[in-house]
């Protein structure tokens, strides 16, 4: 039996703004549940709104007690904040997930091949598929990595691929996060919280597991230990320290993997190895999962004023005596100008068309593109090529006339610093509000582990624009998160 949700509980009928044009992942145009949501839809229809309000409050209390917070630097109030968590899951069918997983694996393998190529033979440049200056003048390109192959030949050990949806079978990659992708702790805590609060839902719905991620991460890191490693590889997580906005995640992952959480001051280079200070003296580290940016990794190689890294670690790395995950120099794959070439990159290294499409992108460094973007700035989303976290971007349709004018000046002054994309009607998923549920735009960050094999965690982190009409899902801009369910066949 298919139930339509009571109108008092379901506010989709009053869609406004961008949401009215978007593909809704839960309901059809006839207000009927799509297949992945059928069982959840029936369960929700029988729930009491007051009960769900209490559950939302319970979830907030769980997150607060657990200490799952983040800080937004540069704001007047940079205190630790909770990321809003929504109790309504995002549900993806097994068929939909298979399609996504195939495209993600193809893309991640292409990224790794691209990194190996640009730091060695540079065949893609010689073939004229990507401009030389885009690589060699890129601030994220590290000459120190030229000619060096990391242990196992893996550059991108952990990847977060941001995906958006615009229709039934229309998925796009929004960006690649190949340097230090974050957010996986929220994926894990979201699932644990949902299982604690709604155990009956996991009996009703056969949901694929994400809880194995810490174990799989440790296995994946151990698999790329240096060739000279004897016995069980020693893994550690390198954090910038307690004042970093993602420190909770660093601590959480180290604890869940059962490995040491270290800062640069805990490590030193001795006898050609990276050694960790312990109560028994110094002991060698084989694999370092670093959450410290390239610039701060080694003050002898990069920024001499860095107190976060380990002096001499790059010499140990290049000698093949430690694995750094992700490899230094992978940040070039996060560059949004490089992103615009991903269809060519995927085809060049895999011999096949990309299974997952890019969002159409104008490179503002090109005069014709710049002219188009300036003339159509009110309709476009404009981003800094090295930007992240929703900073430094303009969403034309929601910006004021003055904001667009000011941004056009910045764009004209440094066109190579920007790309532009159409304003997509991102798919919507319901969030719980005091009057029932309402549609909000979402994206998805699946997490990929790469060693001698590729492992994609089923689901990932769904980020949701909590504010009505907003397309910005970043937590630094007020976005929230959801548990993401991938159903079994």
Language-model regions: role of each:
Residues 3-489:
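Preference for protein termini
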